[in-house]
């Protein structure tokens, strides 16, 4: 069986609120750590979310 090319990752808020989004990424073409600017409802602002592993 072949290894999957898409993996699930967790995007964790850099505002230390504990807010996270779960998304997928292609691990072969995008090998860097993903960062996205998304909305954090706890602080009511757009903040940067960084990639962490799903436990």
UniProtKB/Swiss-Prot annotation:
Gene Ontology molecular function, alphabetical: structural constituent of ribosome
Phylogenetic placement of the source organism: Bacteria, Pseudomonadati, Pseudomonadota, Alphaproteobacteria, Hyphomicrobiales
Biological process per Gene Ontology, one example term: translation
Source taxon at top rank: Bacteria
Pfam families, A to Z: Ribosomal_L33
One CC-aspect GO term: cytosolic large ribosomal subunit
Family of this protein: Belongs to the bacterial ribosomal protein bL33 family.
Keyword set, alphabetical order: Ribonucleoprotein, Ribosomal protein
The protein's name: Large ribosomal subunit protein bL33
Organism whose genome encodes this protein: Agrobacterium fabrum (strain C58 / ATCC 33970)
Entry-linked InterPro entries: Ribosomal_bL33, Ribosomal_bL33_CS, Ribosomal_bL33_sf, Ribosomal_zn-bd
């Amino acid at each position: 069986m072949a290894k999957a090319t898409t993996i699930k990752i967790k995007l964790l808020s850099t505002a230390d609120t504990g807010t996270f989004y779960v998304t997928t990424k292609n691990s072969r073409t995008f090998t860097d750590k993903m960062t996205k600017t998304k909305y954090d409802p706890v602080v009511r602002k757009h903040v940067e979310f960084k990639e962490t592993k799903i436990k």
